[in-house]
Amino acid sequence: MTQPPAAPARRIGMAAGEASGDLLASLLLKGLHARLPRDVAYEGIGGARMAEQGFASHWPMHKLSVNGYVEVLGQLREILAIRRELKQNLLADPPMAFIGVDAPDFNFNVEIAMRRAGVPVVHFVSPSIWAWRAGRIKTIARAVDHILCLFPFEPEIYARAGIPATYVGHPLADEIPLEPDVEGARSRLGLPLGRKVVAVLPGSRNSEVKLLGPTLFAAMARMQAVEPDLAFVLPAANAMLRERIDAMRAEHPGLHLWVVDGQSHAAMEAADVILLASGTATLEAALYKKPMVITYKVPWLTAQIMKRKGYLPYVGLPNILSGRFVVPELLQDDATPEALARETLLQLSDHANAAFLREHFTQMHLTLKQNMADIGAQVVVDLLRGRGKL
C-alpha cells in the first residue's frame, strides 16, 4: 500500500465502513463544508459519495464491508492492519477531530485512541444497543465525546449513561421525497409503465449477494411463473457485484429483469413491491412508502452465535421503528424461494395493506425528517469551538 501524503495543516479524520456509512458521511460533509473554513481537509477511510465531497480515502472502504462473525474472521488480519495504519497516521499528526461513521467494531478502538490523544471524537450512528449488546454503552462512554443518533428514542438511552447525544433525524428522510414519483422513476430506468414492478435488492456486500442471490433469483422465477407480466428491477451496488449478478441472471434467461448499476433509490421508487435484504435499504423502502418483504441469510455458524445474543423479535428497521411487525420478515431457513415468492405476491395483491403502509410510513417519514446534515454538522462545530479547535 502506498503511504498517505503528508498531512495538511488542518484536517478532520473520518472512517466509514460500508455503503450506508458512505452515504451518511457524505451528507454530514456537506454540512461541515458550509460551516468550517475551506482549508480544512477531510481524510481517512471512505467511499465514492464521500469522495464527491472532497474526502481523501487512503484505504479502500470495501475492505471493512464484511458481515457475520465467521466472515470477519477470514478478513480479520487485513482489517486490523488497516486500523493500525489509520491510527498511526492520525496519531502522528492529530486531527482537529475524528468522526467515526457507523462500523462500531472498527471505529470504537480508533476513537478511544483519539480521545486519549486529546482529539475531540464524534460517533455518527448509534449502535443498536437497544436491540442487543447493551453492555457496549460502557465502551461508548470511553470512546466518544458526542454521539449523533438517527432515531428519536436513542438520546434518552445515552442520557441515562451520561453520554452527550443528539437526535439528528435520518438523512434519508431529508433526501427521499415525501411523495414518490413512480412513473418518473420507471421512465428513468426504462421500465414498462403498464406492468407491476418488483424491485429486488440483494444487499451491498459481496457476502450478502453470494448467500442470498441464488434464492432471490429462484423466487423471481417462481413469481413470473404465476404472474407472467411481472417486471423485475435489480440494482447492482458496484461493478464487482454486477458481475456476480449477471452470472446468476444467465441461469434464468427468461426473466423479465432489468439490472441497473446503482440507482437503488430509483428502483425502489419505481416498484409496486420490494423484496430486499435486511439493512438500511429497508428504511429506504419505507420512506418510499412501499410494501416489502424483508429477508436475510448468514452462514450457519454465524446464525447460531446470533441466536444467543438476545435480539429483538424483528430485524427490519420499519418493524423496529414501529415496535411491531408491519412488514413480513423471512430469515435463514424460512427464506426459501417458495416462501419469498408467495409473500411478495401477497403483498402485491393486498391493496388495503398497501394503503395502510403508505399512511404509516408517511408518519414515520415526517418524524425522521430533521435536516440531519445541518444538525449533525453544528454539533461537530460546537464541539470544536468548545475545545478551542476553531
UniProtKB/Swiss-Prot annotation:
Keyword Lipid metabolism: yes
One Pfam family linked to the record: LpxB
Lipid biosynthesis in keyword set: yes
Class of this enzyme: transferase
Example of a GO MF term: lipid-A-disaccharide synthase activity
This protein's pathway: Bacterial outer membrane biogenesis; LPS lipid A biosynthesis
GO biological process, one term: lipid A biosynthetic process
Reactions catalysed according to its record: a lipid X + a UDP-2-N,3-O-bis[(3R)-3-hydroxyacyl]-alpha-D-glucosamine = a lipid A disaccharide + UDP + H(+)
Entry keyword set: Glycosyltransferase, Lipid A biosynthesis, Lipid biosynthesis, Lipid metabolism, Transferase
Enzyme Commission code: 2.4.1.182
Protein name: Lipid-A-disaccharide synthase
Organism: Ralstonia nicotianae (strain ATCC BAA-1114 / GMI1000)
